[in-house]
Amino acid sequence: MARIAGVNIPTNKRVIIALTYIHGIGRTTAVKIADKLGIDHARRVQDLTDEEVLRLRETIDEDLMVEGDLRRETAMNIKRLMDLKSYRGLRHRNGLPVRGQRTHTNARTRKGKAKPIAGKKK
């Protein structure tokens, strides 16, 4: 198993798919990385040479923010909004949808399981 950015990527999968196991790299970014390094999209991770894996690792470390750094950056951005007490920060703090979705009905994913209201029986 190749280890890139602190993640064991599966060796039996194609390079493009295997790179998406790293938090912060999706299909589009994986294709761009492979094209930049001249790696064929159909090749599997187990077929890569040690030099190619090393180049992959260096490219990802230099050019992209992935895994822990990305998670930390996202958390800090949300914390900054909460500290500013902006509208978005208050929505994050209250556990409500941040991007203008309705909450009268729906929004169960963000609000959690429905709470029963006492005295509301027929």
Curated annotation (Swiss-Prot):
Protein name: Small ribosomal subunit protein uS13
UniProt feature, compositional bias: Basic residues: 101-122
This protein's GO CC annotations: cytosol; small ribosomal subunit
Quaternary state and interactors: Part of the 30S ribosomal subunit. Forms a loose heterodimer with protein S19. Forms two bridges to the 50S subunit in the 70S ribosome.
Stored InterPro entries: Rbsml_uS13_C (IPR027437), Ribosomal_uS13 (IPR001892), Ribosomal_uS13-like_H2TH (IPR010979), Ribosomal_uS13_bac-type (IPR019980), Ribosomal_uS13_CS (IPR018269)
Source domain of life: Bacteria
UniProt keyword list: Ribonucleoprotein, Ribosomal protein, RNA-binding, rRNA-binding, tRNA-binding
Function comment: Located at the top of the head of the 30S subunit, it contacts several helices of the 16S rRNA. In the 70S ribosome it contacts the 23S rRNA (bridge B1a) and protein L5 of the 50S subunit (bridge B1b), connecting the 2 subunits; these bridges are implicated in subunit movement. Contacts the tRNAs in the A and P-sites.
Any single GO BP term: translation
A Pfam family this chain is assigned to: Ribosomal_S13
Region (Disordered), start-end ranges: 92-122
